[in-house]
Design a protein with these regions (language model features):
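Nuclease catalytic cores
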Residues: 57-58, 62-101, 139-143, 160-164
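Short acidic (Asp/Glu) and glycine-rich catalytic loops that position anionic groups and cofactors
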Residues: 66-73, 90-93, 122-123, 200-206, ...
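Hydrophobic (often cysteine-bearing) scaffold residues that line and stabilize catalytic clefts
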Residues: 81, 85, 138, 218-221, ...
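Mg2+/Mn2+-dependent nuclease catalytic core
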Residues: 165-267
Length: 324
Protein backbone atom coordinates (compact mmCIF):
# COMPACT_ATOMS: atom_id res chain seq x y z
CA UNK A 1 0.00 0.00 0.00
CA UNK A 2 1.47 3.39 -1.00
CA UNK A 3 1.54 6.60 0.98
CA UNK A 4 -1.58 8.07 -0.62
CA UNK A 5 -3.61 4.92 -0.04
CA UNK A 6 -2.26 4.70 3.50
CA UNK A 7 -3.31 8.25 4.26
CA UNK A 8 -6.78 7.62 2.90
CA UNK A 9 -7.35 4.76 5.32
CA UNK A 10 -5.79 6.43 8.34
CA UNK A 11 -8.60 5.17 10.59
CA UNK A 12 -8.83 1.59 9.39
CA UNK A 13 -7.62 0.31 12.76
CA UNK A 14 -10.04 0.64 15.66
CA UNK A 15 -8.33 1.06 19.06
CA UNK A 16 -9.70 -2.26 20.26
CA UNK A 17 -7.91 -4.12 17.47
CA UNK A 18 -4.47 -3.51 18.94
CA UNK A 19 -4.96 -3.90 22.67
CA UNK A 20 -2.23 -6.55 22.72
CA UNK A 21 0.38 -3.94 21.76
CA UNK A 22 2.35 -2.55 24.65
CA UNK A 23 4.46 0.58 24.76
CA UNK A 24 7.99 -0.52 25.60
CA UNK A 25 9.44 2.93 26.28
CA UNK A 26 9.13 3.95 29.97
CA UNK A 27 6.66 6.81 29.88
CA UNK A 28 8.30 9.05 32.52
CA UNK A 29 11.94 8.28 31.99
CA UNK A 30 13.00 11.93 31.94
CA UNK A 31 11.11 12.90 35.08
CA UNK A 32 13.82 12.73 37.75
CA UNK A 33 12.43 11.86 41.13
CA UNK A 34 14.34 13.54 43.97
CA UNK A 35 13.88 12.02 47.41
CA UNK A 36 12.33 14.34 49.99
CA UNK A 37 14.57 14.40 53.06
CA UNK A 38 13.52 15.37 56.58
CA UNK A 39 9.80 14.76 56.03
CA UNK A 40 7.84 15.20 59.24
CA UNK A 41 4.98 17.30 60.56
CA UNK A 42 5.64 21.03 60.41
CA UNK A 43 8.80 20.70 58.34
CA UNK A 44 9.15 21.53 54.66
CA UNK A 45 11.04 18.59 53.14
CA UNK A 46 14.29 19.22 51.30
CA UNK A 47 14.63 17.35 48.01
CA UNK A 48 17.72 15.22 47.43
CA UNK A 49 18.99 14.64 43.90
CA UNK A 50 19.17 10.91 43.14
CA UNK A 51 19.18 10.70 39.33
CA UNK A 52 19.53 13.12 36.45
CA UNK A 53 18.42 12.62 32.85
CA UNK A 54 19.72 14.48 29.79
CA UNK A 55 16.32 16.18 29.41
CA UNK A 56 16.24 17.47 32.97
CA UNK A 57 19.89 18.51 32.81
CA UNK A 58 19.00 20.52 29.72
CA UNK A 59 16.02 22.04 31.55
CA UNK A 60 18.26 23.27 34.37
CA UNK A 61 20.75 24.72 31.90
CA UNK A 62 17.94 26.54 30.15
CA UNK A 63 16.15 27.74 33.28
CA UNK A 64 16.48 26.49 36.89
CA UNK A 65 12.86 27.49 37.54
CA UNK A 66 11.76 25.23 34.67
CA UNK A 67 13.63 22.32 36.27
CA UNK A 68 11.87 22.99 39.57
CA UNK A 69 8.42 23.08 37.97
CA UNK A 70 9.03 19.76 36.22
CA UNK A 71 11.15 17.74 38.64
CA UNK A 72 10.44 19.13 42.12
CA UNK A 73 6.88 20.46 41.90
CA UNK A 74 5.94 17.94 39.19
CA UNK A 75 3.30 20.30 37.82
CA UNK A 76 1.20 18.41 35.27
CA UNK A 77 1.05 19.76 31.74
CA UNK A 78 -1.45 19.16 28.99
CA UNK A 79 -0.27 16.74 26.30
CA UNK A 80 0.21 18.27 22.86
CA UNK A 81 -0.11 17.01 19.32
CA UNK A 82 3.65 17.51 18.95
CA UNK A 83 4.44 15.24 21.88
CA UNK A 84 1.99 12.64 20.61
CA UNK A 85 3.60 12.64 17.17
CA UNK A 86 7.10 12.27 18.60
CA UNK A 87 6.12 9.45 20.94
CA UNK A 88 4.24 7.55 18.25
CA UNK A 89 6.96 7.98 15.62
CA UNK A 90 9.65 6.73 18.00
CA UNK A 91 7.64 3.62 18.77
CA UNK A 92 6.90 2.95 15.10
CA UNK A 93 10.56 3.32 14.14
CA UNK A 94 11.63 1.02 16.96
CA UNK A 95 9.23 -1.64 15.71
CA UNK A 96 10.36 -1.12 12.12
CA UNK A 97 13.86 -2.30 13.04
CA UNK A 98 12.42 -5.38 14.73
CA UNK A 99 11.32 -6.56 11.27
CA UNK A 100 13.54 -8.44 8.82
CA UNK A 101 15.47 -5.96 6.68
CA UNK A 102 13.49 -6.57 3.44
CA UNK A 103 10.25 -5.69 5.25
CA UNK A 104 11.43 -2.25 6.41
CA UNK A 105 9.44 -0.39 3.78
CA UNK A 106 7.52 2.89 3.91
CA UNK A 107 4.21 1.04 3.80
CA UNK A 108 5.14 -1.07 6.83
CA UNK A 109 6.25 2.02 8.75
CA UNK A 110 2.93 3.76 8.03
CA UNK A 111 1.07 0.71 9.35
CA UNK A 112 3.29 0.55 12.43
CA UNK A 113 2.58 4.22 13.10
CA UNK A 114 -1.18 3.61 12.86
CA UNK A 115 -0.90 0.60 15.18
CA UNK A 116 1.16 2.52 17.70
CA UNK A 117 -1.20 5.49 17.66
CA UNK A 118 -4.29 3.32 18.12
CA UNK A 119 -2.81 1.97 21.35
CA UNK A 120 -1.22 5.20 22.61
CA UNK A 121 -4.42 7.12 21.93
CA UNK A 122 -6.26 4.88 24.40
CA UNK A 123 -3.52 4.76 27.03
CA UNK A 124 -1.96 8.23 26.89
CA UNK A 125 -3.89 10.65 24.67
CA UNK A 126 -7.61 9.87 24.91
CA UNK A 127 -8.75 13.52 24.71
CA UNK A 128 -6.09 15.05 22.49
CA UNK A 129 -8.28 15.84 19.48
CA UNK A 130 -11.62 17.63 19.38
CA UNK A 131 -12.79 16.10 16.10
CA UNK A 132 -12.20 13.20 13.74
CA UNK A 133 -11.07 15.61 11.01
CA UNK A 134 -8.46 17.17 13.31
CA UNK A 135 -7.06 13.74 14.17
CA UNK A 136 -7.02 12.69 10.50
CA UNK A 137 -5.12 15.83 9.47
CA UNK A 138 -2.58 15.17 12.23
CA UNK A 139 -2.24 11.56 11.09
CA UNK A 140 -1.69 12.43 7.44
CA UNK A 141 0.89 15.08 8.36
CA UNK A 142 2.65 12.50 10.52
CA UNK A 143 2.79 10.03 7.62
CA UNK A 144 4.37 12.73 5.45
CA UNK A 145 7.15 13.07 8.03
CA UNK A 146 7.70 9.33 8.06
CA UNK A 147 7.91 9.35 4.26
CA UNK A 148 10.70 11.91 4.57
CA UNK A 149 12.64 9.52 6.79
CA UNK A 150 13.27 7.17 3.86
CA UNK A 151 14.97 10.01 2.02
CA UNK A 152 17.50 10.28 4.85
CA UNK A 153 18.59 6.66 5.17
CA UNK A 154 17.73 3.14 4.04
CA UNK A 155 16.67 1.19 7.15
CA UNK A 156 17.15 -2.11 5.33
CA UNK A 157 20.87 -1.46 4.82
CA UNK A 158 22.05 -1.95 8.42
CA UNK A 159 21.20 -3.63 11.71
CA UNK A 160 21.12 -1.42 14.81
CA UNK A 161 23.30 -2.58 17.68
CA UNK A 162 20.89 -1.04 20.21
CA UNK A 163 17.31 0.26 20.08
CA UNK A 164 15.61 2.29 22.83
CA UNK A 165 18.48 1.43 25.16
CA UNK A 166 17.60 2.12 28.81
CA UNK A 167 20.73 3.43 30.51
CA UNK A 168 21.21 4.00 34.24
CA UNK A 169 24.88 4.70 34.89
CA UNK A 170 26.80 5.73 38.00
CA UNK A 171 29.52 8.24 37.21
CA UNK A 172 31.48 9.19 40.34
CA UNK A 173 28.77 10.34 42.78
CA UNK A 174 26.17 10.93 40.04
CA UNK A 175 23.52 8.61 38.62
CA UNK A 176 22.60 9.50 35.03
CA UNK A 177 19.59 7.90 33.41
CA UNK A 178 18.04 8.11 29.96
CA UNK A 179 16.96 6.24 26.85
CA UNK A 180 19.21 6.14 23.79
CA UNK A 181 17.13 5.95 20.59
CA UNK A 182 19.51 3.95 18.45
CA UNK A 183 23.15 2.93 18.10
CA UNK A 184 24.69 1.25 15.08
CA UNK A 185 28.00 0.46 13.43
CA UNK A 186 28.53 1.75 9.91
CA UNK A 187 31.37 1.49 7.42
CA UNK A 188 32.55 4.80 5.99
CA UNK A 189 34.65 4.98 2.83
CA UNK A 190 36.74 8.09 2.20
CA UNK A 191 37.67 9.65 -1.16
CA UNK A 192 40.84 7.55 -1.31
CA UNK A 193 38.86 4.34 -1.02
CA UNK A 194 39.93 3.57 2.55
CA UNK A 195 37.21 2.30 4.87
CA UNK A 196 36.71 2.41 8.61
CA UNK A 197 34.00 1.22 10.98
CA UNK A 198 32.23 3.86 13.06
CA UNK A 199 30.08 3.52 16.17
CA UNK A 200 27.23 5.99 15.74
CA UNK A 201 24.47 7.18 18.08
CA UNK A 202 21.34 8.36 16.25
CA UNK A 203 18.37 10.32 17.57
CA UNK A 204 15.11 11.01 15.72
CA UNK A 205 13.32 14.34 15.95
CA UNK A 206 9.89 15.08 14.52
CA UNK A 207 10.11 18.81 15.24
CA UNK A 208 11.81 21.38 13.06
CA UNK A 209 15.59 21.50 12.96
CA UNK A 210 17.30 24.51 14.54
CA UNK A 211 19.28 26.80 12.24
CA UNK A 212 22.83 25.51 11.61
CA UNK A 213 24.36 28.14 13.90
CA UNK A 214 22.42 26.67 16.83
CA UNK A 215 22.85 23.01 15.92
CA UNK A 216 25.70 22.35 18.36
CA UNK A 217 23.42 22.98 21.34
CA UNK A 218 21.07 20.29 20.07
CA UNK A 219 23.81 17.67 20.57
CA UNK A 220 23.87 18.16 24.36
CA UNK A 221 21.84 15.03 25.15
CA UNK A 222 23.63 12.87 22.58
CA UNK A 223 27.02 13.78 24.01
CA UNK A 224 25.73 12.63 27.41
CA UNK A 225 24.69 9.32 25.87
CA UNK A 226 28.11 9.01 24.23
CA UNK A 227 29.67 9.53 27.66
CA UNK A 228 27.45 6.83 29.16
CA UNK A 229 28.48 4.40 26.41
CA UNK A 230 32.15 5.16 27.10
CA UNK A 231 31.65 4.49 30.81
CA UNK A 232 29.68 1.25 30.35
CA UNK A 233 31.50 -0.23 27.35
CA UNK A 234 34.94 1.28 27.47
CA UNK A 235 34.65 2.59 23.92
CA UNK A 236 34.12 6.12 22.67
CA UNK A 237 31.41 6.49 19.99
CA UNK A 238 32.76 8.03 16.82
CA UNK A 239 29.76 10.12 15.81
CA UNK A 240 26.34 11.35 16.90
CA UNK A 241 23.49 12.13 14.48
CA UNK A 242 20.24 14.06 14.73
CA UNK A 243 17.63 13.16 12.12
CA UNK A 244 14.97 15.88 11.89
CA UNK A 245 12.14 14.38 9.88
CA UNK A 246 10.41 17.75 9.54
CA UNK A 247 12.61 19.14 6.80
CA UNK A 248 14.17 16.72 6.50
CA UNK A 249 17.52 17.78 7.96
CA UNK A 250 20.44 15.75 9.26
CA UNK A 251 23.07 17.12 11.64
CA UNK A 252 26.15 15.09 12.56
CA UNK A 253 29.03 15.63 14.98
CA UNK A 254 32.20 13.59 15.31
CA UNK A 255 33.01 12.75 18.93
CA UNK A 256 36.32 12.39 20.78
CA UNK A 257 37.43 11.79 24.35
CA UNK A 258 38.22 15.46 24.93
CA UNK A 259 34.58 16.38 24.24
CA UNK A 260 33.33 13.64 26.56
CA UNK A 261 35.72 14.70 29.33
CA UNK A 262 34.27 18.21 29.02
CA UNK A 263 30.73 16.80 29.18
CA UNK A 264 31.65 14.87 32.32
CA UNK A 265 32.82 18.12 33.92
CA UNK A 266 29.67 19.90 32.79
CA UNK A 267 27.47 17.22 34.36
CA UNK A 268 29.45 17.51 37.59
CA UNK A 269 28.82 21.27 37.61
CA UNK A 270 25.12 20.87 36.83
CA UNK A 271 24.69 18.22 39.52
CA UNK A 272 26.37 20.49 42.09
CA UNK A 273 24.26 23.48 41.03
CA UNK A 274 21.02 21.48 41.30
CA UNK A 275 22.00 20.20 44.76
CA UNK A 276 22.77 23.77 45.85
CA UNK A 277 19.40 24.99 44.56
CA UNK A 278 17.67 22.18 46.46
CA UNK A 279 19.39 23.24 49.67
CA UNK A 280 18.84 26.99 49.28
CA UNK A 281 15.43 26.88 47.61
CA UNK A 282 16.65 29.40 45.03
CA UNK A 283 15.53 28.57 41.50
CA UNK A 284 16.06 31.68 39.35
CA UNK A 285 13.94 32.06 36.24
CA UNK A 286 16.12 32.67 33.21
CA UNK A 287 14.15 34.52 30.54
CA UNK A 288 14.90 34.07 26.85
CA UNK A 289 13.17 33.57 23.52
CA UNK A 290 12.51 29.99 24.65
CA UNK A 291 9.97 31.30 27.17
CA UNK A 292 7.39 31.48 24.39
CA UNK A 293 7.54 27.66 24.21
CA UNK A 294 7.31 27.08 27.95
CA UNK A 295 4.26 25.38 29.48
CA UNK A 296 4.53 27.55 32.60
CA UNK A 297 5.04 31.05 31.21
CA UNK A 298 1.37 32.03 31.32
CA UNK A 299 0.44 30.21 34.52
CA UNK A 300 3.23 29.77 37.08
CA UNK A 301 6.43 31.61 36.20
CA UNK A 302 7.38 34.51 38.53
CA UNK A 303 9.45 36.11 35.77
CA UNK A 304 6.18 36.72 33.92
CA UNK A 305 4.22 38.06 36.87
CA UNK A 306 2.74 34.82 38.23
CA UNK A 307 2.77 33.32 41.71
CA UNK A 308 3.75 29.63 41.53
CA UNK A 309 1.77 29.01 44.72
CA UNK A 310 -1.37 30.48 43.12
CA UNK A 311 -1.07 29.74 39.41
CA UNK A 312 -3.29 31.39 36.85
CA UNK A 313 -5.66 29.22 34.85
CA UNK A 314 -3.94 27.58 31.90
CA UNK A 315 -4.91 29.01 28.49
CA UNK A 316 -7.31 26.82 26.57
CA UNK A 317 -5.36 26.97 23.29
CA UNK A 318 -2.95 24.18 22.44
CA UNK A 319 0.41 24.82 24.05
CA UNK A 320 3.19 25.60 21.63
CA UNK A 321 5.77 22.87 21.46
CA UNK A 322 8.29 21.06 19.38
CA UNK A 323 7.95 17.43 18.48
CA UNK A 324 10.38 15.09 20.11
Amino acid sequence: MGFREGAAVWFRYAPGCVTALRYSRPMDIDADSPILAGTHAGHVPTPVLTTLSPSRASDFKTCPQLYKFKSIDKIPTEPTIHQARGTTAHLALERLFALPAPERTPERLYDLFRDAWAQLKVDEYPDLFTSVDEERDWGIESLHLLAAYFGMEDPSSFEPEELEMDLTVDIDHMTIRGILDRMERIVEVDDAGSSRELLVITDYKTGRAPPPQYANKAFFALKIYALLIRVTRGITPDRVRLLYLNGPTEYTMDINDRQLDAMHQQLEALWAAIEKAMQTGEWPARTSALCDWCDFKDTHCPAWGHDPAQPDERPTSDAAGADG
